[in-house]
Amino acid sequence: MDILVTVFYIVVCVMLFSLAIAIHEFGHFIVALKLGLRVEAFSIGFGPALWKKKVNGVEYRLSAIPLGGYVSIPDVDPEGTKVLEGGGKADAEAKAKIPAWKELLVAVAGPAMNVVLAVVLAVVLSLIPSAKFGELPAKIGEVPAEGPAAAAGMKAGDVVKSVGGRAVRTWTEMQTEVQIAGGKTVEFVVTREGVGDMPLKITPKRDEVSGAWFIMALSVTNATGAVAWMPDRSPLRQLAWDAGSIFRVLKGLVTPREAKATSQALGGPVMIAEGLYRQVRRDPLDGLGFLRFLNVNLAILNLLPIPVLDGGLIMFALFAMVFRRRVPDCVVKYLSTAFMVILMGLMGLLIIRDSWRSYKIHTHKDEVEKCQSAEVEKCGESVTNGTANATSQAR
């Protein structure tokens, strides 16, 4: 029976993840059609087609691997279409005849649909009477004597105001800064009743099983029981908060003194899948909250100005609009190939590291549970949540 329940939740997670990718591709698809561009195929899933039907020149497919999907638009991305279709000739001449502003709109449409889905999910969650909202405050509940925090003089009741010079209001923001700091000594400014603001120098400790950094199992008082990944009931305020947290991690990746620790906290498909599975199994509302945040991540990451991502297509289209000429096809091809190799290599490394991390977490479950306090989720989940925005934070 347990196996059937597990299979059920896995199927649900696959469907939710596929929804996020499919809605992204649908954005490209519908805008391309409305602009009169040639669309050859729209597929739910990858690999061999299990079912297909051609309607008005577009072949609709249901493919064997139910993880996302793709849309084939030769006029906008001939090289990408060539790869997806498994051969054939890239129609670069057709692309040259398409106005750059149309390419721009098609490229933006995918991430825009992810944002729309995130807002819709946030609105749905905000309208559910039983849903609770609110974030754990950055207030210390208990300080184990053997940890770095206790050694630095932190006490129960302290309210953390800043970490490493960055203001924090919530437990999540505090944990994000701890992960980015890594093993470097960082200054915490805390407010203590009867004393006021005081600085504390703390060096985070790394858990060898999960790979996460902690100032030693600090527990937060007054847990809210709120929907995971959505502390604010307002969809727009929550969207702004999400964007800020994601850009904070991206900034950490390109900041020399933060890059190493930030990259160690990142996770790929395995950790994201585990995070989604755990949230869905615990509470359907938490699953929707995680899916909402995942869509914001997909939108922002796809807009990065990197060839092979939507942001790369946007960058090339803007170049053509500003300078009245296109980036040479050979340059686009070489850049796209190079970055595809880099991204696939990084993805492979993340999958290997995540799989090893997941194995250690599951084979040392008792040790992992001890590394965090009772009301903060298990260490493995904290790491998953902390890396889901390749991705971002620990709850």
Where in this protein do the model-derived segments appear?
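Extracytoplasmic/periplasmic/luminal assembly and interaction segments
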Residues: S162-E208, S358
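Conserved PDZ fold ligand-binding element
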Residues: A149-T172, L335, A394
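Small-residue-rich helix-interface/hinge motifs
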Residues: F8-G86, L294, L301-F323
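Structural signature of transmembrane alpha-helix termini at the membrane-water interface
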Residues: I30, K34, V123-I128, L250, ...
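Terminal peptide-recognition signature
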Residues: H24, L62, G110, A149, ...
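Internal alpha-helical transmembrane segments
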Residues: A22-I23, K34, G69-E142, G287, ...
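Functional transmembrane alpha-helices
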Residues: G88-W101, G196-L200, P204-L298, A317-Y334, ...
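PDZ/PDZ-like groove recognition
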Residues: V119-A156, V168, E258, D354-R357, ...
